[in-house]
Amino acid sequence: MKKLLAVFLAFFLAGLAVPANAGEFGDTLRPKLSAARESLVTMMLHKDQRGSDQQKLVKDTADAVSAQLAKMKAPAGKEAQFKELVETWAAFKKTRETELVPLILKGKDEEAKKLGGGIQKERITKCQNLINELD
């Protein structure tokens, strides 16, 4: 009976030893990533939503992703995936701020759609996939 209790206790305690960030990426980062994407897509598709309020929302939502990433740590054994997520997001954000948003604001919609549907789509998809791997 003591042996059975010891085995049960070991399994129970092992369950408590799950890293504190299990699910953290999907629960906290994914919604911020989605909000950042949605704010930019709204600006791109709706010419009447390119004013200062929407521009601020586009910047704030991207900054929220960066801030959340800065608070997070790689789960044990997944340091490479976390590093790749941070680097991919940084490239995505830089292109967004220095190329994509300026194209949208200049009314160069076709160029913006090409950039948004090309490398930026690849990067955001990679970020989403890495979040899945990190959870």
Tell me the role of every PLM-derived stretch.
Residues 6-9, 25:
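Internal alpha-helical transmembrane segments of multi-pass membrane proteins, especially GPCRs
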Residues 91-98:
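Extended, amphipathic, non-transmembrane alpha-helical segments
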Residues 23-84, 103-119:
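Membrane-proximal N-terminal soluble sensing/regulatory segments of transmembrane proteins
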Residues 1-4:
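Positively charged n-region of N-terminal signal peptides that target proteins for export
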Residues 13-22:
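Sec/Tat signal peptide C-region and signal peptidase I cleavage site
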Residues 115-135:
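Extracytoplasmic
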